């Protein structure tokens, strides 16, 4: 790789690619000004010419840059570089480099997660959400792949990639063929294409808690459409029917978070967090 592609802004040296998502690549990089390792999320070059994706990426940067909380992956800097081949502007975000594993990796490892640990993980997520919701930002994409378990055992939520200020939630999100958000953690109102608020994050956290407790999400299917339909129409089985170690109190919190009607869920992340702490 040439020098023009391994350096960003004469400050960040890209070292190793550590992740690829639907719209971006994540690199481990060295910040030569401050002498530290960081993570750089860079829009995929093949998407850089797409103004819709560029706007989405910039929105991510603006949303995340204002969030400063121990349970949220910190955003340090944003910028833009020119791709030497296409000469298109390629936006990037510089973030805290977190050592650890995503909860998706933890779940795929196959080892049973103790119910008490599942509750602790979700308390960390809800701490992050209480903070972002107070700032007017709905995450919209809470799922195991977006939650990091650090080496010291703390939780960090990342990738506010489709987060928007609540004031913007009436905007349509049907520009792309794929439903934005992951089907297994999609709230019924998102599945129907309706306006969402912080209670969509409560629902997704309920899906996450369910999967951490029993090893699979509340709804599975052959296609995203079939899963989305279940979110809208089907009642999930109580987690305790799949794992006898799950207590009635755990069932109650999980199923309240998974209520079809947002009015029947926890109204705030703080209230769901308190219910988990009191179990």
Task: Enumerate the predicted regions with their spans.
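Eukaryotic protein kinase
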Residues: 1-277
């Amino acid at each position: 790789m040439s020098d023009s592609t391994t350096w960003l802004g004469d400050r960040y040296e890209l070292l190793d690619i550590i992740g690829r998502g639907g719209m971006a690549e994540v690199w481990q990089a060295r910040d030569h000004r401050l002498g530290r390792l960081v993570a750089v999320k860079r829009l995929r070059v093949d998407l850089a010419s797409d103004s819709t994706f560029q706007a989405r990426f910039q929105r991510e940067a603006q949303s995340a840059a204002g969030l400063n909380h121990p349970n949220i992956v910190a955003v340090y800097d944003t910028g833009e570089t020119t791709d030497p081949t296409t000469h298109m502007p390629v936006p990037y975000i510089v973030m805290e480099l977190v050592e650890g594993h995503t909860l998706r990796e933890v779940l795929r490892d196959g080892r049973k997660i103790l119910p008490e640990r599942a509750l602790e993980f979700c308390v960390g997520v809800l701490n992050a959400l209480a903070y972002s919701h107070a700032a007017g930002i709905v995450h919209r994409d809470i799922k195991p792949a977006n939650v990091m378990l650090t080496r010291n055992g703390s939780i960090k939520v990342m990738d506010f990639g489709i987060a928007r200020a609540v004031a913007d939630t009436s905007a349509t999100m049907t520009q792309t063929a794929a439903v934005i958000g992951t089907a297994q953690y999609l709230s019924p109102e998102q599945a129907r294409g309706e306006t969402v608020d912080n209670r969509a994050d409560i629902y997704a956290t309920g899906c996450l808690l369910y999967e951490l407790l029993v090893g699979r999400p509340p709804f599975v299917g052959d296609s995203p459409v079939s899963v989305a339909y279940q979110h809208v129409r089907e009642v999930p089985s109580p987690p305790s029917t799949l794992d006898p170690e799950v207590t009635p109190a755990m069932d109650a919190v999980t199923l309240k978070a998974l209520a079809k009607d947002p009015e029947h869920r926890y109204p705030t992340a703080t209230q769901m967090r308190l219910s988990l702490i009191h179990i």
